[in-house]
Swiss-Prot record:
Keyword Flavoprotein among record annotations: no
Region (CPSase): 1-162
Name by which UniProt lists this protein: Carbamoyl phosphate synthase arginine-specific small chain
Active site annotation, chain numbering: C241, H326, E328
Ranges for domain Glutamine amidotransferase type-1: 166-353
Subunit structure: Composed of two chains; the small (or glutamine) chain promotes the hydrolysis of glutamine to ammonia, which is used by the large (or ammonia) chain to synthesize carbamoyl phosphate. Tetramer of heterodimers (alpha,beta)4.
Record organism: Lactiplantibacillus plantarum (strain ATCC BAA-793 / NCIMB 8826 / WCFS1) (Lactobacillus plantarum)
Ligase found in the keyword field: yes
Listed GO biological process terms: 'de novo' pyrimidine nucleobase biosynthetic process; 'de novo' UMP biosynthetic process; glutamine metabolic process; L-arginine biosynthetic process
Reaction(s) catalysed (UniProt annotation): hydrogencarbonate + L-glutamine + 2 ATP + H2O = carbamoyl phosphate + L-glutamate + 2 ADP + phosphate + 2 H(+)
Pathway assigned in UniProt: Amino-acid biosynthesis; L-arginine biosynthesis; carbamoyl phosphate from bicarbonate: step 1/1
Positions contributing to L-glutamine binding: S46, G214, G216, L242, Q245, N283, Y286
One Pfam family, short name: CPSase_sm_chain
């Protein structure tokens, strides 16, 4: 059956329905330039309320491996591809991408020239879009019929080990790979809801706090900023992606929306201290405003080489550090994992100082 992709500016593409074929969807359209990693991308909670257009022309050729999912469900509202593979040729595959989309009730469209779509987004900026079963005649009226999705809050867990160091992750939409990277380095991890009070966090006796990635506009999380500052006074604090932006806001900086976001696996980032360049995985539509850093205690540690946007921050006299990119990758290059080593080393040093 036909599927219609309509952008807010009236531009339309017609293709064939995939996934949950009868389902219609709406969300902010973004493009992802990764040649691989579609499963990790689709299950990244940061893509909540977004429709992902994959620029690589063939998606789904190595199927679905349940061990690499970043969350139990698909975060994206819809998937847009040029061609969906009819085979899944990999020894780890347990099902096709087509069946994965159907089981998780995700709408999709194939037969779209996603590179043409990407050029259009780059020229006009990110915008809302609707994936429908019929042509759209009144975009705003149709858009009003869709309700945005919200993440389910994580309950308070039960700490079952005495392993040190213990890192408490405030889960704004955490990818599973973040926990895995910390555990691979010997840390115990407890994942807490972002609404956890200082008292609730303290009950787990953490040695450090990590603010996770997550979806949406960072200014929508303003109610957490005071708690973030209080946590930074008591524990070493790190932030990834949204967590990075929240640390910036908590210390007086501002954020802004990028024209079309960073969504891909090959973003070059340079460390300000030594000039070292790493390739990073990125997924964000907002960034910290460089002009707003002046007058705050924050110091820029990393920048993106394509557009000069801020990719890392720290506080010089507190154990606070953050990065805009995804050091855990999954998908993407593994060059940025040093961030976790640095954070755990900071925790170790703070433990010695406070002993």
């Amino acid at each position: 059956m036909n599927k219609y992709l309509t952008l807010a500016d009236g531009t339309q593409w017609i293709g064939t329905a995939i996934g949950d074929c009868q389902l219609e969807a709406a969300g902010r359209i973004v493009f992802n330039t990764g040649m691989t990693g579609y499963q990790e991308t689709l299950t990244d909670p940061s893509y909540l309320n977004q429709m992902i257009a994959f620029t690589y022309p063939l998606i789904g050729n190595y199927g679905i491996d349940p061990t690499v999912a970043q969350a139990p469900t698909i975060g994206a509202q819809a998937i847009i591809v040029h061609e969906l593979a009819t085979f899944n040729d990999h020894y780890t595959s347990r099902q096709s991408l087509a069946s994965f989309l159907t089981i998780h009730h995700v709408a999709g469209i194939e037969g779209v020239d996603t590179r043409d779509l990407t050029i259009h987004i780059r020229q006009t900026g990110a915008q809302m879009a609707i994936l429908s079963n019929h042509p759209i005649t009144d975009f705003e009226a149709q858009l009003a019929t869709f309700a945005p999705q919200v993440l389910t809050a994580t309950p308070l867990p039960v700490a079952t080990t005495t392993i040190r160091p213990r890192v408490a992750i405030l889960n704004f939409g955490e990818k599973a790979a973040i926990t895995a990277e910390l555990q691979a380095r010997g840390a115990d991890v407890v994942v807490l809801p972002p609404t956890a009070s200082l008292k609730a966090v303290a009950a787990y006796h953490p040695d450090g706090i990590l603010l996770s990635n997550g979806p949406g506009d960072p200014t929508d999380y303003h109610t957490y900023l005071a708690t973030i500052r209080q946590l930074a006074q008591r524990y070493p604090l790190a932030g990834i992606c949204l967590g990075h932006q929240l640390i910036a806001l908590a210390y007086g900086a501002q954020t802004y929306q990028l024209s079309f976001g960073h969504h891909g696996l090959n973003h070059p980032v340079q460390a300000c201290a030594d000039g070292r360049i790493i390739m990073t995985s990125q997924n964000h539509d907002y960034a910290v405003d460089p002009a707003s850093i002046k007058g705050t205690p924050l110091i820029v540690t990393h920048t993106e080489l394509n557009d000069g946007s801020i990719e890392g921050l720290r506080l010089p006299h507190q154990a606070v550090m953050s990065v805009q990119f995804h050091p855990e990758a999954h998908p993407g290059p593994q060059e940025a994992g040093q961030f976790f080593d640095d954070f755990l080393l900071t925790i170790q040093k703070e433990a010695v100082v406070n002993a």
